[in-house]
Amino acid sequence: MSTGAQSKAAVAGQHADGPRLLADVGGTNARFALETGPGDITQIRVYPGADYPTLTDAIRKYLKDVKITRVNHAAIAIANPVDGDQVTMTNHDWSFSIEATRRALGFDTLLVVNDFTALAMALPGLTDAQRVQIGGGARRQNSVIGLLGPGTGLGVSGLIPADDRWIALGSEGGHASFAPQDEREDLVLQYARKKFPHVSFERVCAGPGMEIIYRALAARDKKRVAATVDTVEIVERAHAGDALALETVECFCGILGAFAGSVALTLGALGGVYIGGGVALKLGELFTRSSFRARFEAKGRFTHYLENIPTYLITAEYPAFLGVSAILAEQLSNRSGGASSAVFERIRQMRDALTPAERRVADLALNHPRSIINDPIVDIARKADVSQPTVIRFCRSLGCQGLSDFKLKLATGLTGTIPMSHSQVHLGDTATDFGAKVLDNTVSAILQLREHLNFEHVENAIEILNGARRIEFYGLGNSNIVAQDAHYKFFRFGIPTIAYGDLYMQAASAALLGKGDVIVAVSKSGRAPELLRVLDVAMQAGAKVIAITSSNTPLAKRATVALETDHIEMRESQLSMISRILHLLMIDILAVGVAIRRASTNGELPEAVAQAKARASDDETADVLDWLSHGASPAAKDVARD
């Protein structure tokens, strides 16, 4: 089918990187399609989820059925919250890692979004044939759009125009408190209160809410209702003319209309309010002839305001495909030329100046960036149909030192390459899966540390260490590894240092410390009472304590300076893995900082930088940094090998 959903920058024709896989995964069925070009969605097929052990199996079956051997980019709308890399469906037994699924299927890109977010992103591209206007009003171009989706729950969202794109709002507006507007709705509220401690709009105007209304009205009329009556049966009875069912539907539509009017006022949705989900669509003419529109406008002094806002019922058969298509197109656009990805912008700008052979490498990097990142040079050369020296020349044409440097910059430029959340390792994971999860979790934690680290505290810690008379590193258990590493680095500065992993040695040594001495205490939990008592003794004698630990712990609160390294690995029952890496990195940062201070005659950072620039050939100055492997001279490499 041709969807008519095109972005403002859409180009006619087929996608240069091949067909894109689109999916709409619900609790019962998984729907798949191919998008061959902007708005051209074909090969729509539906597969029962129960027939396939995993989502990966269902996707493979679809690709086999449509005879597609290679898909580069894919996007999935799923009826489930999506928060991080691991998705566990609440209405089906599928559970999967987004990144592991991408690797298993060989995709360059795999996006997974909530189905209601996808539905919201579909709205700007809907044609008149894919929606029915309910009542009057005229939508204002480039204005906020509202969306309600009465289905199993009551989804609420909005779209905000931003330049040439739309931003979808995340919302839990369906859980706003239900506010009855007449005596009949008062009865519904009273009945619902007997079942729920909080009666939200979702309780009464989502699909299951129709049953609540039906039973409340039956109780009013003293009618007995079978325990098996559900929303599907109520709708069928209403279509057949049953009086109680008709009143139930009318009440339901009125409540939904009142809520939609409130959403329109809240968002200022002059671009219109859309109704999605399956319930309203199944009501058909019962919905279009109901009091929905009248109740939408009935807002007292703002009735005239709402009269000008149109309301639409979404009738498109597969609206989620339109939304994930738009989201995927925006993601790929950002990657290939957006301001968020400087390396891709550089490739695009320089492409015409490259040799024909180098252009083939450039095209491979733009269209298949993960192939460049993951493959050895021999495979990259084969895929681009060039020689290996051509690959190296291409990298240097972009200002990179070589292929490794280019791979690093390319990986940094990829949007959404590394999941910024923790992925759990499960029994049965292959080495590829659990290996990638361990690496991804560590990289994710490092990136989050970079975003949240208090560098003012880092500067204070460096000043304290640089002026210390003696530095002692304390770590118990696994943290002793970090303490020993710190001792190895810092004794080279000519400062008396030692590392203790034994509590009794820590207590004995701390009792001898005083003013000018510094303890660097490394602890994952920050709660060991024995260590805290040792530090109290040293601080009372005038020593300072730098803590490398988690935030809001007793150690962090006691320390002179706390360098907080929060992460998902917080339970004391877990072996320190990620925390150990973060603590080692903090030691590296402190060591580099002290090295820079020591490169200056007076210890001041600005002068150290100036001297380093003026004396770039001075081996003695350069070696202060280079033995830490963060300098630039060849001398660093010799030390790093030891």
From Swiss-Prot:
Region: Glucokinase, residue numbers: 1-340
Subcellular location: Membrane
Class of enzymatic activity (EC top level): transferase
Span list, region Putative HTH-type transcriptional regulator: 341-642
Membrane association type: Single-pass membrane protein
Domain SIS: 461-600
GO process terms (BP): glycolytic process
GO molecular function terms attached to this record: ATP binding; D-glucose binding; DNA binding; DNA-binding transcription factor activity; glucokinase activity
Residues the record lists as binding ATP: 23-28
InterPro entries: ATPase_NBD, Bacterial_glucokinase, Glucokinase, Homeodomain-like_sf, HTH_RpiR, RpiR-like_SIS, SIS_dom, SIS_dom_sf
Domain HTH rpiR-type: 341-417
Alphabetic keyword roster: ATP-binding, DNA-binding, Glycolysis, Kinase, Membrane, Multifunctional enzyme, Nucleotide-binding, Transcription, Transcription regulation, Transferase, Transmembrane, Transmembrane helix
Record Gene3D superfamilies: 3.30.420.40, 3.40.367.20, Glucose-6-phosphate isomerase like protein, domain 1, Winged helix-like DNA-binding domain superfamily/Winged helix DNA-binding domain
DNA-binding region coordinates: 377-396
Pfam families membership: Glucokinase (PF02685), HTH_6 (PF01418), SIS (PF01380)
CDD domains: ASKHA_NBD_GLK, SIS_RpiR
Enzyme Commission identifier(s): 2.7.1.2
Protein family according to the UniProt entry: In the N-terminal section; belongs to the bacterial glucokinase family.
Classification via PANTHER family: GLUCOKINASE
Full protein name: Bifunctional protein glk
